[in-house]
Amino acid sequence: MYYKIDLSNYEPREVPAYQEFTNYNDISSEQIQVISEELAEFKDSFGKDWQEWNLKDLRSRLKDNWTFYLTECGWCFIDWNRKYPYLCNRYIIPEYRNKGLGSDLVWLRCNEIKQQGYNYASIKLEDWNKPALSVMKENIFTKMD
């Protein structure tokens, strides 16, 4: 289900340290290695193999007006090419899951979107993904048609 996020009254939140990339060449070889290893072991919430994207996709996305955010515990993207900036591909490394870090990845992107002057964003949240739905307790999400 796609949701519109109303950020018109949003106050920026404190989030863990992260790095922001809009150019693939700015990502260090060590970071690429860690990302590659994690992608090789990429599992969905049910522990099944899942390949949402790869390093070629990362390079293409960064050339196509996306932003990649990397933290110690995971990563996420913003696709700036839509009517509302789209929060997509949030991933938490398994040993860090169920600690609220997924919500932090939502809030760091909301902080960025608000800082860039937008009042709305969008996100896809699946009904089966209970940890991802935890952000819904905030009263800023409305279903999109």
Residue spans of the language-model regions?
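Conserved acetyl-CoA pyrophosphate-binding loop and the N-cap/start of the following alpha-helix
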Residues: Y96, G100-L108
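Conserved active-site alpha-helix within GNAT-family acetyltransferase domains
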Residues: S103, D127-D145
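Acyl-donor-binding surface of acyltransferase catalytic domains
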Residues: M1-N25, D145
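Conserved GNAT acetyl-CoA-binding A-motif
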Residues: I113-L125
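Helix-loop element at the rim of GNAT/NAT acetyltransferase active sites that forms part
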Residues: V34-W50
